[in-house]
Amino acid sequence: MIAYLIGVDGGGTGTRVRIADRSGTLLAQGSAGPSALGQGVEAAWEHILSAIQAAFHSVGQSIPGWSECAMGAGLSGISNLPRRDRFLVMNPGFARIALESDAYTALLAAHGGRPGAMVASGTGSVGEVLYANGVRKQVGGWGFPVGDEGSGAWLGLRAMAHAQAALDGRAST
């Protein structure tokens, strides 16, 4: 029987989890290193499990058997089907797993599940929209260096290029 509902937000910088009981009452929160699938499926599982363990430990609770847990995860890189499949094959025993992109779960969180749009600019960048008719569209999110306009890496490269051009006298300061 599923006793715990675990929500995972997994990206290129870190992993955050929330654990609730079956009624949806928040019990604990935890965090760990990155769980973007592009940084390795094994590493993603390692950090997700570490964040879950940290959450349970933060409230003085022992870690239950994974078969008592259902996990819903918004993960960066989930659209890469071979990585997604490998992630699912490596399931350590969760009773259920639901996977979505971290962009879509961020959109759902930002708008309470209602139609809307959002742009995330952090380690990576992506835009996502959910229309009133249920259709969704993602823009960007292809990863560094070709599809990450607005990300930290993209902005940093542009800033360094401008600074060097300014030092050469080819750009204004």
What are these regions (language model features)?
Residues 5-9, 68-72, 116-120, 127:
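Short glycine-aspartate micro-motif
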Residues 1, 95-119, 135:
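Conserved phosphate-binding catalytic cores of ATP/NTP-utilizing and phosphoryl-transfer enzymes
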Residues 46, 50, 105, 153-161:
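Residues on a specific face of well-ordered alpha-helices
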